[in-house]
Structure formats: structure tokens, C-alpha cells
Amino acid sequence: MAKITFIGAGSTVFAKNLLGDILSFPDLANSEIALFDIDAERLRTSEVVANRVAEALDAHPTITATTDRRQALEGADYSICMIQVAGYKPGTVVDFEIPKKYGLRQTIADTLGIGGIMRGLRTIPV
């Protein structure tokens, strides 16, 4: 059984979608899923959502949630880094507001356009 660790699991929507994709593969449906985030409240929400996704897919993963990064990564076969450097505010807001100020349209996609470049410059060093 594979252990898959989500780093930055407090991003509930992204975690939900990614977990749904992972658990849809029979070989991964019984994986150990370790959710990690520094924000305990958001992490708890993601844990509840993860359990609902597993139930909806009739998958039976072992889901754990922790604010201890080392614990989450211990024994992991795969780790998925989903952190957002600077968070929603100011990070994402600035990624949209600066292009808007100069008449440029920033799409929702995280890695496209001027906002995507700014996000990349914040995230790549991490």
C-alpha cells in the first residue's frame, strides 16, 4: 500500500479534486493518505472532505491529518507539494490586482500570465 503525503492540504478544493483523482485508480484506492498543513482549522476541514470523497468513491484509504510535517512525510512513497507561498491574501489577490491595474486580464489558472509568473517567482525557491 502506497503512502501519499499532501503538503499544504489546507487547500481544501485542490486537495479534494486531487484526492478524487488518486482514489479513482483501483491500485491507489486503499492507499495511506497523510494530510499536512500548518493551519489546523483548514486541515480539519480537508480531513472531513477527504473522508467524504473516499466514501463517495467507495475507496478505503487510511486518512491521517497532522500539523507535524515530519510525521506526515515519514515513510511516504509520494509527496505532493500544494503550498501557496503568501497565501490567498496577499498572494493570489496581488496576482490578479497588478495585471488588472495595467489593463491585463489574468486568468484563473495559477501558472499563466503575469500573475502566474509572480506566483512562480514566489514558489520556485521553496
Show the residue positions of the predicted features:
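Short acidic low-complexity segments
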Residues: 62-75
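N-terminal Rossmann-like NAD(P) cofactor-binding module of classical short-chain dehydrogenase/reductase
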Residues: 73, 77-83
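NAD(P)-binding Rossmann-fold cofactor-contacting core
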Residues: 27-53
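Residues at the starts of beta-strands that form the adenosine-phosphate
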Residues: 3, 32, 62
